[in-house]
Amino acid sequence: MKLKNYSLILLMGMSSSAFALNVYNKDGNTLDIYGRVEGKIASGQNSFAGSESRSDLGGRIGIYLTRDLDILPETKIVGRLEWQVRTEKNDNNTGESDMEARYSYVGLSNKTWGELITGRTKNPLYQVMKMTDKYKNFTPNIYSYGITTIDDSYQFNRQDGTVQWNAKFAGNEIQLAWVSGNGNSDNEALDYGAMASYRKSFKFGDFRITPAIAASRYKRQDGVVTTD
């Protein structure tokens, strides 16, 4: 009997959601520092190691700031800066990309109406992508299924040059974004783009299901041709 190739995946080390530490909270101003360290060892064709056995160490660090806005009730000014430390692309960079910006945005957050932010954001497409993103090294590549990138400023889940509204109403999550790009991408193909998503949670006892839908539309710069 001919045996097909089987894969063995072994995870070791520490992997978690971001741990946060509040280092300042006074007079309506807050400052949180957070981060994550992730270590992985894998072997097999269905893992990031391919046909070999490899390890990967990565992580992230960020700061989140808020300030009460007195002129608008229940509203805060918010800002986030987050960096990727070394890499999350399953290799071991030790050069200039040791620290890459993941998020950098400022905006307003209202208790009732949600937040309006601008900068490099976690875009609306991630409402769908986050369902399996935590397993991206060991599941089919969700980034390939109808999700398009045409230049460095219009890509999968971290979006440059974006004005975005995020809101939650009675279990409904809505995100809308207008994308102008950052003007410093490798091929500057983007003229403008728009994204939207909707996510709803249903709970049946201890069981919960959360369907989501997202859409993305964009316009290329006139005269720019790419293969994406």
What are the functions of these language-model segments?
Residues 37-44:
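Short polar catalytic/cofactor-binding loops
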Residues 183-185:
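Extracellular/periplasmic Venus flytrap/periplasmic-binding protein
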Residues 7-8, 18:
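Cleavable N-terminal signal peptides
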Residues 191-228:
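Detector for outer-membrane/organellar transmembrane beta-barrel domains
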Residues 1-7:
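Bacterial N-terminal signal peptides that target proteins for export
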Residues 14-22:
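Sec/Tat signal peptide C-region and signal peptidase I cleavage site
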Residues 22-37, 49-181, 190:
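Outer membrane beta-barrel
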